[in-house]
A protein has these predicted regions:
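Short amphipathic
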Residues: 1-5
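Solvent-exposed beta-strand sheet faces enriched in polar/charged residues
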Residues: 6-8, 27, 59, 72
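C-terminal structural segments of small proteins and small subunits
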Residues: 34, 42-75
Length: 75
């Protein structure tokens, strides 16, 4: 499954919020430095979809706030 994600780094509170267009807004407290926000996004989405972290892959947007995420099923 592939989903579009909009990331908000350095948020006061973290969480995953579905948006009307079918994408997700992911708020993380980690800063967008040295991949810390990406790691926090992977952690948040793994928890949200109840899958292991290794099942969450950033396909596009590693350096931006808009990302294309792939969730691998059956891992």
């Amino acid at each position: 499954m592939r989903i579009h994600v909009r990331v908000v780094p350095r948020a006061k509170r973290g969480g995953v919020e579905p948006l009307p267009d079918g994408s997700l807004k992911v708020r993380v407290s980690a800063p967008a430095e040295d991949g810390r926000a990406n790691a926090a996004v992977i952690e948040a989405l793994a928890e949200y979809f109840d899958v292991p972290r290794r099942a969450v892959i950033i396909r596009q947007g590693v350096t931006g706030r808009s990302k294309l995420i792939e969730i691998l099923q059956g891992t």
